[in-house]
Amino acid sequence: MSYLIKESDGYRYIDEGQGDVLLLLHGLFGALSNWDGVISHFSKNYRIVIPMLPIYEMNPREAGLEALVAFTEGFVASQKLNDLTLIGNSLGGHIAILYTLKNPEQIKRLVLTGSSGLFENGMGGSYPKRGSYEYISERVAYTFYDPKVATKELIDEVFE
């Protein structure tokens, strides 16, 4: 499915449905399309908000969990979101944990899927290689139990 990507206050995001807010945070090699099933199912009863995390746009020396939590805090403030159900996948789950610890008054529920955790202090041994289609392709395929799920279309979306 294709959803309108909105832009405001320097943030790019999807905002679908009405009701209580489900804020979804994608993973390191995630793409917005990873949330298609969630959006189509839950947007009937909830407002689904998905910011595009600036994982590859950030300066590698400044990029990290703290910066991504700060980005999320800025996004939540700019959109005036509160009483959130925060759902994070993979790296998005790690960001969600740290965000919740810093801002517990804003969180109604926390949902983690395949999350990295509190006892990890970074994004692995090295920062992802920018501009390497082969590297991104390998990492996206590695994300799934069945690597065939990592279609060229999905890899292209993550690479962009």
What does each model-identified segment do?
Residues S8-I14, G37-S40, V49-L91:
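Active-site loop/oxyanion-hole signature of alpha/beta-hydrolase fold enzymes
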Residues G19, G27-G30, S90:
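Active-site glycine-rich loops that stabilize anionic/oxyanionic intermediates
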Residues V21, R47, N82-T85, Q106-R109:
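Structural signature of beta-strand start/N-cap positions in the alpha/beta core
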Residues G27-G37, I48:
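Serine-hydrolase catalytic-loop signature spanning alpha/beta hydrolases and amidase-signature enzymes
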Residues F29, L53-E57, G117:
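Alpha/beta-hydrolase active-site loop signature
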Residues H94-K102, Q106-E138:
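Flexible "cap/lid" loop of the alpha/beta hydrolase fold
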Residues R130-E160:
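Conserved alpha/beta-hydrolase catalytic His-Asp/Glu region
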